[in-house]
Amino acid sequence: MKGKIKLIIIALLTVLLVSGCAKKDDAVKEENEDTKTVAENTETSEKDENKADDEISVVTNIYPSYDWVKEISKDTNVTVKNLTDKGVNLHNYEPTAEDITSIKNANLFVYVGGESDEWAPDAIKESPNVTAINMMEVLKDNIKPEEVIEGMEDEDEDHDHDHDEKDDHDEKDDHDEKDDHDEKDDHDEDEDEHHHHHHDDEVEMDEHVWLSLKNAKLVCNTICENLKKLSPKYADKFDENLKAYVEKLDALDKKYSEELTNQKFDTVLFGDRFPFRYLVDDYNLKYYAAFVGCSQESEASFETIVFLANKVDELGLKSIFTLSDSDHKIAETVKENTKDKTQEIRVLNSLESVTSNDNTSYLEVMEENLESLKAGLN
């Protein structure tokens, strides 16, 4: 009996011993797994942090420069955001608080620098860590003033006409005023003339610089140099990408020169505002248009319509051009006022409303513009 009790006690002790060891092993295993998980999470977090620290953020405000940055930064650590990627035209764009924050958080900000970007300098001042590229400053030797040519509506002249009518009305009212009041009015008139003269002296520069392939090449070089400073380890890749892209720009520039030479017509007639001065000047083309490139006008005067229609008849033009993102109404009205009314309405794309969702590229759009010009000038 004593022997059986002894065996039972030994068996119980053995079970307790094995159970205790198993629990200890499980605890050690669980502790090891927890330690491994913490280590893995820490490593992942460090990798994500390093990736974020290493990433170069670029913000642009028009599709062409967005596309140039994308091309130059292929297979590198650069991310690009375009502020007008929702399809808003550059001339109508107003930055949101989110846009300003994007600029503040960016390493590089590429903007046009023209009349439509009057908000940009203040945004840059609030972003001390961002490097800014003003395209018009880069191209300062190539910048052209907006010009009002024959037949084109001059918004300043319309303003002057209204101002003159007001002066005539004031002059009539002055006949009933006292001499001392006349003296005050004369003083005010002198001031008005001074301010008006100052307004006339202001020259608005044409901001549509991206529509010249030659300008595109210069801006791309500047973008590349700045990316190399921001991310030196990818310098060779930036240079490689730039070289490949510039070759494409040069090839298309050459194609423009060759295919627009010796066309039947050398004049582009535009029933719209005209942002293509850099383009036509590059290839020695003449032009007529309803408005200057930055005009906000949408309806042309009777005189402008008649002038353009008569010019179509005079030159025997077979095509009337307009912007791809316009309603084409002015071009159609010009056509209806020509003698035979058989002209083709053709479009050119100014790239002001193109977005990354349009499944195209700067080069593709410029190629399409060439084809439209060739068809319209034959």
Go through the PLM ranges and name each one:
Residues M1-G3:
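N-terminal secretory signal peptides that target proteins for export/translocation
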Residues K6-I10, C21-N378:
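Extracytoplasmic metal-acquisition and chelation regions
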